[in-house]
């Protein structure tokens, strides 16, 4: 075999930023073998097996490539993974179970499993303390977002969705000073100037106790959900909503209210 035909080692390692939507220091870290092993173990604990095409599979492929390239060695672990953990968490939301995978505190994978209406109704009562005879309100749906996306840094799409929700809850286009919409916009503006996700204001900081922060509240309807989804989409450069985010929670609440006919 001539020198030109010799297989070449990759010039650079496969990093987290190459295969996942992560930011900050983690994005530049090569994926290490023990990181992949920890994710495989975490997926197996939750699902009973590793997910086909899931984070563990992606990480294993990347770690193997990095070992072949000589960038990492068997037994190596990324410092952020070792310090902050590799975890898989499950959260029940109206009509679905959301499974989220984390490395070093950042999301690297998410799966949404639809759930039957009866199960969803019972779950909603447990999560937000609702009577099954009462409709889910906008404030309660916003609070449910804390369960599914509380650690997400607030961006302009979140702020727009929260503003749309507050407008519909209060029945006025006037944004109340110090309300959740104003707080969300302030958080989004602040976060746009910050590089590290760890230093950014999160949804939990804005939406915790949302019901008590609204001047008024109302049961979520399909029209409310459509307005919130539209606002989040218009302000997202990718024209998508965030899994488990504000629009998703409002939509799930509206769907449950319709199915329960309350």
Curated annotation (Swiss-Prot):
- Return the GO cellular component terms, semicolon-separated: cytosol; nucleolus; nucleus
Q: Which GO terms describe its biological process?
A: intracellular monoatomic ion homeostasis; response to lithium ion; seed germination
Q: What induces it?
A: Stimulated in embryos by the transcriptional activator ABI3. Not induced in vegetative tissues by abscisic acid (ABA), osmotic stress or dehydration.
Q: Pfam families from the xrefs? A: SMP (PF04927)
* InterPro entries the UniProt entry points to: LEA_SMP, LEA_SMP_dom
Which keywords describe this protein according to UniProt?
Answer: Cytoplasm, Nucleus, Repeat
Residue ranges of the motif Nuclear localization signal (NLS): 6-10
Where found in the cell? Answer: Nucleus, Nucleolus; Nucleus; Cytoplasm
Instruction: Domain (SMP): give its ranges.
Output: 14-68, 136-192, 201-260
Q: Which domain of life is it from?
A: Eukaryota
Q: Which tissues express it?
A: Embryo specific, only in dry mature seeds.
| Annotated function | LEA proteins are late embryonic proteins abundant in higher plant seed embryos. The function of those proteins is not known. Promotes germination rate. Enhances cation toxicity (e.g. lithium ion) and osmotic stress (e.g. NaCl and sorbitol) tolerance during germination and in seedlings.
Concerning its family, UniProt says: Belongs to the LEA type SMP family.
* Protein name as annotated: Late embryogenesis abundant protein 31
The species is: Arabidopsis thaliana
